[in-house]
Amino acid sequence: MKPCILPWINFSTNTFGRPRVCGYSGVKTPTKLKDSDISTEWNSEYFKEIRKDFLNGEWPENCKRCKYVESLDGISKRMDENGFWYDQYKHLIDQTADDGSVPYEPPHIDVRTGMICNLKCIHCGTGASSKWQEDKALLDKYPNTENYQINNKWIEQEHGFWNHLRNTWHQTKRYNFLGGESFANKRHNEFLKDLSETEYAKDVNLAYVSNGTLITEDRLEQLSKFKSVVLRLSVDALERAGEYFRFPIKWDVYVEQLRLIDKFIKGKPNFDVGVQWTCSNVSMFYLVETYDIIRKEFPNIKFLFCNHVEWPIHMSAQNLPKEIKDVILNKINNYKFKDRDLDSFPFYVNHMMEKDLWKEHGKTLMQYLDDLDAARNISWNYSFQEMELHKYDPR
């Protein structure tokens, strides 16, 4: 097995500032960046052990998610990232010491910009969006609604971490920002503005996963100063279903936002923009319709199969009645996807069908939706009416 290149090039954090190799990491590290720094953590035992495991031809404990995807013949993050970066950076692997350490700073910085967010998506939760704190009745009731008492001032308000990044502008070639919502973070926005005005910007690659709601034409002009911009916009369902899923967006407003972006990037090869779809029980049902509208309405924006929900488990695509899974299979089998996607979507079908979690977690999903309705004055029965979930309510 070819090693994943990320442990040799990428330093990442979660929303609480814990170091990790990437967003799919399965091991929780004990240290937080507010108590340490990137240089120290880059050669921590966590990173060193992962490098050594890959060099020994073994899957690290940290990387179970990619191992699972590949076991179902899916395209894993390891495969994707190696496709982008392995040939460019494979020489760095040879610099690995016997203890797994490397003698250089990470060329890629992958930063979770805290929990500040303007949406509260139903497959997300309090650990990634501050807006969930509005739903007081749901706090501590579900796995994804834990009432965290986390001090994220180090990344959301204070300057120390961001100044550390400024000090390495001359050697960092790529920044990958995720939230929360990065464009809602004032310190991030200041950092981006400052970097865009330097001599280094033309040599820096940027990547974002964003909900897209805060991207303006001025912001796009600012981003255009960089060598390249990979922009991934989170979309899981359309119209009524999309408004419920990514509350409190308004679909018509969001469509205009996509039109603005689609128009701006036309003819600009340094922009790579795609909507990033995550497989869940709800988004799987609306996959074909969502794929179709992106395909037809936004010619410069790609549809990308990017992720699947494992947690909270009640939002997993495996947590659906068999009858609804059969409807989904029928819709997918009767739709002609683009040739470039024919190798991408089968994993999500295989994942959905691998397990039947409805008997164990169906009640939790239905109660969760009822609680969301009460907290947000919305209606799952209206928003997801095509699913006819009420027919299978096991309570």
Enumerate the language-model features and the residues they cover.
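Metal-dependent nucleotidyl/phosphoryl-transfer cores and adjacent nucleic-acid-binding surfaces
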Residues: W59-R65, S76, Y104-E105, N176, ...
